């Protein structure tokens, strides 16, 4: 698969290992015109959570983050390394054109999209994209680590296990609209949940499972043959980061 001269592809991404994995995979199949990395907004996200969820829930989430940083991250690394063996999850700097921005909704991104007029914009790990940005390209495609519409938001695989629905652990490739993972579904790919999985290994499995589906979606969009569908069999719900008690319940579900 490859792009012709008038079929520009831009990637909007966060700086993390899984975004690198997707970017490098797509770069093997397509000519990537530009990669735009959005800076993290930790303080802004914390303020949003406090307003949306309340101090008690946020305190539980922060307690979980401490456990994640001190324990889960380290324990998960060997399995993640095995999963990523044979794949390139290194930063694409020096190999692809890179632009660092504070926000995907800022002036630099607006100017870049207006200038390059991409046929497809791939999204991985950024914040919500404004309507005015979405109007600058015909197709925005997102990779989401959850089966929508049931697991919108973050950590969809985690929440599927938490609810006792490992059959709904998987990845959704979908068109981007102004909502939170509410765009029309292009493809959904399930994963196999194992008893030794963790909060951190599930997203790795979800990205790996959907790499080919994303490539197919991008090619279909370039060819003008992209098709979508909706799932009316699943209730729609947005999920947030887990609290420590919720993580402990997740661990019990895995056993």
State the predicted function of each range:
Residues 1-255:
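One-carbon transfer enzymes
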């Amino acid at each position: 698969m490859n792009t012709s001269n008038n079929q520009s592809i831009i990637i909007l991404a966060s700086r993390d290992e899984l975004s690198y994995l997707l970017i490098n995979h797509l770069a093997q199949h397509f000519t990537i015109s530009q990669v735009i990395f959005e800076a993290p907004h930790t303080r802004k996200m914390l303020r949003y959570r406090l307003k949306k969820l309340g101090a008690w829930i946020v305190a539980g989430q922060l307690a979980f983050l401490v456990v994640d940083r001190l324990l889960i991250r380290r324990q998960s690394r060997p399995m993640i390394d095995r999963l990523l063996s044979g794949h390139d999850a290194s930063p694409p700097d020096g190999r692809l054109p890179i632009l660092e921005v504070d926000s995907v909704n800022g002036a630099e991104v607006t100017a870049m999209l207006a200038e390059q007029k991409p046929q497809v914009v791939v999204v991985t790990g950024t914040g919500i994209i404004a309507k005015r940005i979405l109007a600058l390209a015909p197709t925005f495609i997102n990779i989401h680590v959850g089966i929508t519409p049931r697991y919108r938001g973050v950590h969809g695989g985690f929440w599927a296990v938490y609810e006792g629905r490992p059959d709904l652990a998987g990845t959704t490739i979908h068109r981007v609209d102004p909502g939170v993972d509410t765009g029309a579904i292009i493809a959904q790919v399930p994963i196999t949940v194992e008893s030794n999985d963790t909060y951190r290994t599930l997203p790795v499995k979800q990205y790996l499972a959907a790499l080919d589906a994303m490539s197919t979606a991008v090619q279909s969009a370039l060819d003008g043959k992209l098709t979508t569908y909706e799932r009316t069999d699943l209730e729609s719900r947005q999920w947030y980061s887990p609290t420590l008690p919720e993580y402990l319940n997740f661990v019990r579900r895995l056993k």
